[in-house]
A protein has these predicted regions:
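Class I SAM-dependent methyltransferase SAM/SAH-binding core
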Residues: 72-107, 113-115
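A short glycine-rich, Lys/Arg-flanked "PGG" loop and its adjoining helix->strand segment in the class I
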Residues: 141-155
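A short SAM/SAH-binding and catalytic strip from SAM-dependent methyltransferases
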Residues: 127-140
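Class I SAM-dependent methyltransferase "Motif I" SAM/SAH-binding loop
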Residues: 67-69
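Conserved class I S-adenosyl-L-methionine
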Residues: 1-56, 156-177
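Short conserved loop adjoining the S-adenosyl-L-methionine
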Residues: 118-123
């Protein structure tokens, strides 16, 4: 067997089923949005600082933040780059981003109300794409196709690391014991 013979999308979907994973509807995220904004936006975090440093976004670059939530990365990125496209399927999360956009007078943020499953023909390309903990999708192939079509330079993906979802070997490899 060679790698091209492996259907990674099928394996991924089987894994999601085995973990009893399901995506929350946008209305659940709408309800969580104010508290998440309070707890996450503008708060120091080793994860956030490490990811922003690794992304090394330049002033002349654009960023597409997929699953942007309440603006955890949108706000600091908008303060350092040309433009940020904040995409989320929760209107409540986008409402939080809008509040921060107004508070900090960041006119370089564009809100996009879409899900991974939606048609993305009108989503602009960006130099840098970020999908932080927002890649638990139903169709891995479709996600990869969207990332490829929208990225001009770099893509940064991170995943959730809850124990029920990942193999113990992954935790050992990344040095986590919590």
């Amino acid at each position: 067997m060679i790698i091209n013979d492996i259907n990674f999308n099928d394996l991924y979907q089987q894994h999601l089923k085995a973990c009893n994973h399901y995506n929350l509807p946008p209305t659940k995220w709408d309800k969580k949005a104010p508290k998440m904004a309070e707890n996450l936006v503008g708060k120091p975090s080793r994860y956030n600082e490490t990811l922003l440093k690794a992304m090394n976004v330049q002033p002349n670059e654009t960023v597409l933040d997929i699953g942007c939530g309440p603006g955890t990365f949108v706000i600091p990125l908008a303060q350092q780059c040309q433009a940020v496209y904040a995409l989320d399927y929760s209107q409540g999360m986008l409402d939080m981003v809008q509040q921060y956009k107004e508070k900090y007078q960041l006119n370089n943020i564009t809100l996009l109300h879409k899900s991974w499953a939606d048609n993305w023909d009108d989503v602009p390309q960006a130099d840098v794409i970020l999908a932080s903990r927002s890649t638990l999708v139903d169709d891995l192939d479709d996600m990869i196709e969207k990332l490829q079509s929208k990225a001009k330079k770099r893509v940064f993906l991170t995943s959730v690391t809850q124990r029920h979802f990942l193999d113990e070997g992954v935790f050992e490899a990344i040095g986590r014991d919590d």
